[in-house]
Amino acid sequence: MNILVSPYNKENHYFRSDSTLIRTVPEFYIPDFVESISATPILVFRVDLPGKVIDKKFANRYLGKFMYGVMLTPQMKESVHPDFQEYLKHSLDYSTIIPAIMTEKESLDKFLSEENPFTVEINGWERFRCTQNIPLDKVYEKFSRMTQFCSVRTGDYIAFE
C-alpha cells in the first residue's frame, strides 16, 4: 500500500511509505533528531481499482471513499545529514493520519460547510479550518496526471494537500 501525495498548487507528487500511516494520534512522540513538526491538512481518497495512465474521465471509477486527514512533516535538527533529512521528511513513522472510517465520494461537495468544518487542533489550539471542498473534477485531473508516472493499486491512498 502506498500513499501518493499531491502538494498544494504544484504539479508534482511524491510517495509516503505505509509505515507513516496511523488512524488516530492520541499522543505523538517527537524523536530527538526532530526540531519541530508542522501539520498539513489533506483530502484523502482510497484507490478501488489498480491502474496506470488513467484518463480524467475514468478517474471516478478508480477513486473510492474519501476523508480528511493530516500529514505531520518534521523539520530536522542541523546535526542530521542533509541527505537523510529529505528521506525522513516523507517517512517519519506515524506521520500520516488518515481516519479508518471514510465517506462515499458522491457526498464530497456537501461534506464541509461553515457549520461542519474540518479543523486541525494542536495542543487545544485551532491551527487550521476548512469549510470548502476541492471540486471532484480537480481531484480527477490531478489523479490522472499522477498516474501518467506511476501505477496505483487497490488500497493505495491518494492525498491532496
Positions of PLM-derived features:
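Catalytic-core "active-site belt" of small-molecule-metabolizing enzymes
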Residues: 1-157
